[in-house]
Structure formats: structure tokens, C-alpha cells
Amino acid sequence: MASAAEAVEELTRLYRELPPRPAVEEVEAAEAVLASADAEEAARLDEVAREEASASASSSAAAPGRADGELLAVLREARRNAVRLRALQQRKEAAYVVELERRFKVFDDLIQRASRVVSSSSDAAEAGGGTTGDGYVGVGADSVDLEMELRKKEAAVAAAAAVAEMERGSKGLAALGLESKPISSLRRDVSAGTDMEKLSLIQVASLIESSAKKGITELSLRGKLVDQIEWLPVSLGKLQDVTELDLSENRIMALPSTIGSLRYLTKLDLHSNQLINLPDAFGELSNLIDLDLHANQLKSLPSSFGNLTSLANLDLSSNMLKALPDCLGKLANLRRLIVETNELEELPYTIGSCTSLVELRLDFNQLKALPEAIGKLEKLEILTLHYNRIKGLPTTVGSLSRLRELDVSFNEVEVIPENICFATSLVKLNLSRNFADLRALPKSIGNLEMLEELDISSNQIRVLPDSFRCLSRLRVFHADETPLEFPPREVVKLGAQAVVKYMNDLNAARGTNQKKTDRGSFWTWLFSLFGCCKKNQEVGLPV
């Protein structure tokens, strides 16, 4: 039977041999990871079940053969097994931390029990002056020495643990360029390799815990997550003091509903991920001003999206959106809306309620028309519709009194409404590449006196309207692959101002009842333009 001193010595040795104890933040992070892994596993299994039900319904009409049926059953089980294995892998590191902390708590209890035993033995020895019934030495100094020895060793262990934690905390994740420095015994050694510089799920959760306790206001994880992280931990909602959050350039597929707790968030960057949808709680981010969701896989927006009433800048480009929700009209403070490279077939009529819009980019979609309500966007300055299927513009486009740039190139536009000439602030107008459809410009195009750039390339326009002469500010004019006959191609090649001067001179000539300009008079005009007119006979030109 070991003596009390030997028992204390053995207990102390065992305690010293334990691995480093995880910090509180690490334990909380591990618990958050386990909760997230459970939620992700359940969601993925539900998705597999829905896919199976859909496939079963579609194949019910044509019953598969026995071999095919067995293969499908094997495939379904393989999918479910893959989901469970993925969840197991995600839980592995977190489960170790949680179990490690549980074992440390057991040791804490054992240490306390040992301390109580020694203390009670010491008290009994002092009172009785002899040997206790438990066999411990009862007289005087021996039991006191044992208690002092135990306490001394406990203090030594605690000091060693504190030093270890300080050493770990001094390194943290600073080498990764992150603002917060959580104490983490699970930190990977940062090497020159790109993969080794990224964070595992539990490291992300630990960083969130530490950042939340420090009350940080800005956090960037741009490109910092390992590729295996597709779901963020539910503890993300603890970052309640954060105003700017950058999660871009990762492989995130889903956000936890707890993101709605980030009530002070004003800027959120999620571009270049794999987001399929947004949680309903997303609409609770009522202070959000800047939101970047471009380059994801979004197919729809939640109905709560209209609650983001502070939103000023929204980038939804390069997704898979086929429609925008009607609630978009509630975003009265929205100034910049980018929805390029989606699958939009129409805009909601409520777009007209976004009266603060200054910039609207809809390039590379499947739009066939614009709603008349577009004319209510009185502050709109930029409207781009490049590469859609639009056949005509609404007459209300003339109400866009502040419009400076309009691009309807690569469409199927047949007629440009005369009303567009009331948009007298236009500086840049691109009507190119409507190919066989567009045959004429508005007769009143000369009203656009601020126009500096005009592109009518690859259309079927043959004649410019007389009012073209009023475009005195025009400095760029493109008409490539457009069969212009009037003015002649030679004039167009000389540039925008040459065309304007030609139209002016022609109008003046008509005003003095001169005959219609023919080929000979064109050459006379051309040489007068350069101040080098000579007699036709001297240069051999036709008369």
C-alpha cells in the first residue's frame, strides 16, 4: 500500500503528464463546432432525402429494372454515408477538445478530494496527537508536511500551466494577419505553404470566441478558411460588436441563422463563395449598408431581404438569380444595384420604389423588357443592359433627367423611343450591336446636347437625322459595320466632330436652297474641312 506521500507524488506526476489544458475559448469553440456539425449533417441528409424523393417520383412512370433499382439503392446509401463521414471528420478535433476538458474536470475533482483527505488528516493529527484510523501518520509534522507538499505541487502545476498558456497566447494566429490572438493549443505551425496558413473549423470557432470577448469591430477571414469548411459555426452570432466582416474568397455554402444577431454590422463581404441561399434571419441585419454577394450560386433571395432598409450598395452579380423579389422595392436607400451575369427574365415593378438608385447594372441576363416603373428612378445616372434580349425601351426612360450613361448594346432593340431625347443629361449612349433590328435613330437626338460618346456599330442605320448637327460636345462616334450612306463613310472615319460639321454644313446648304450634296460636293466639303480646297481639275477629282 502506498504511503500518503507517495500517493501525492504519483498524483502530481500524473497531472504534470497531461496534455495542455484547452482555454475557455477553445472549449466554447469546440462546442460550437459540434453544434454546427450536427446541424450541417441534418441539413445535408434532408437534402439527400429530397433529391431521392424527387428522383423516385420522376422515375415512377418508367419502373427501373432490378439491377438498376439495386444500383440506385447503393447510390443513396453511399450519399448518406458520405455525409456522415464528413460530419465525423468535422467533429473529430472538436470532440477531442471537449473530451480533454471533461477529463481535466475529473482530475480537478480528484485533486480536491485528495486535498480534503490530507487536510482532514492534518486536523485529526493536531487534535489527537497520534495515528488516525485511516493509517495516516497522525502526530504533528508529517501530515502537515504532506498537505504542504500537495499544495506546493498544485501551485507548481498551476504556475507551469499559466506559463504554457502565456507562451501559446503570445503566438496565436497573428502570423495569419488576423486581428485577434486567441489562446489555442490547436494552432497549426505556420509555414510557407499556402494550405498551412489557412484555418480549420475549430480554429475559426476559437477565433470567433476570442474576438467576441475582446469586442472587436472589424474581422477579415478573406481566403483564410481551409477548403473543407462549407458551413460556419453557429457561434458566429456572438460577434455582436462587429461592424465590418469579410468572409470572401472561401468555399462557404451556408450561413448560420445566428448571423442575424450581428445588429451593428454595416459592411458584409461574401463574394466568391458557394452560397446557395441565405437564411431568413439575414433580414435582421437592419444596419447593413454595403453587401457584396457576387460570384456565388444564389438562386433566390429570402422574403426578409426587404428589411435591409439601410442598404445602399448591393452586388448580386455572377449568381443564378432568375428573379428579384418584390420586396426589393422596400430598399428606399439603395443607391447602387449590380445584378450582372444572372438569369433574370424580368424586373419587379417595385423597382420603381427604389428612388435613391444612382447606378443600375443588368448586363448579361435574359431580360426582354423593362417595366414602365423604371421612369420613377429620377436619381438614376447609370443604366447598363448589355447583352440581354430587350426589343424596346419604355417611353418613361425620358423621365430619367439625371441619366448620364445608357448601354443597350447586344440586344434586339428595334426602335429607340423619341422620349429618350428628354434625358438631356446623357453623356454616353451605346446602341451598338442590335444588328438587323435597329434601323434609325430618334429624330430629336440633337436634344442630347451633353452627349460626348455615341456607338451605333453593327446596326442597320443608313441615315443620321438632321438634328445630329446639334451634338456639339460629341467627341467619340463609332459606326463600325453599320451601312451608313449619309453621311458618307469617309466622313465618319474622320471622327465625331467631322460628322457634326458635315451635318451642319449640309443643313446650311439646304437653307440656301442648294442642291442635295452629291459625291463631288462631298470632296469639296472634305478639303474645306482641312483648309486645303483646290480646284477639282488640279487634283483630278470628279466634278
From Swiss-Prot:
Q: Name one GO biological process term.
A: intracellular signal transduction
UniProt LRR repeat ranges: 239-262, 264-284, 285-307, 309-331, 332-354, 356-377, 378-400, 402-424, 426-448, 449-470, 472-494
Q: Supply the PROSITE patterns for this chain.
A: LRR
Location of the motif GVYW: 495-502
Tissues where the protein occurs: Widely expressed.
InterPro entries, per the entry: Leu-rich_rpt (IPR001611), Leu-rich_rpt_typical-subtyp (IPR003591), LRR_dom_sf (IPR032675), LRR_domain-containing (IPR050216)
Q: Which UniProt keywords apply?
A: Leucine-rich repeat, Repeat
Q: What SUPFAM superfamilies does the record tag this protein with?
A: L domain-like
Inducing factors: By light.
The protein's job, in short, is: Leucine-rich repeat protein that likely mediates protein interactions, possibly in the context of signal transduction.
What does the sequence similarity comment in the record state about its family?
Belongs to the SHOC2 family.
This one is known as Plant intracellular Ras-group-related LRR protein 5
**What phylogenetic lineage does the species belong to?**
Eukaryota, Viridiplantae, Streptophyta, Embryophyta, Tracheophyta
Q: Per UniProt, what is the name of the gene that codes for the protein in this document?
A: IRL5
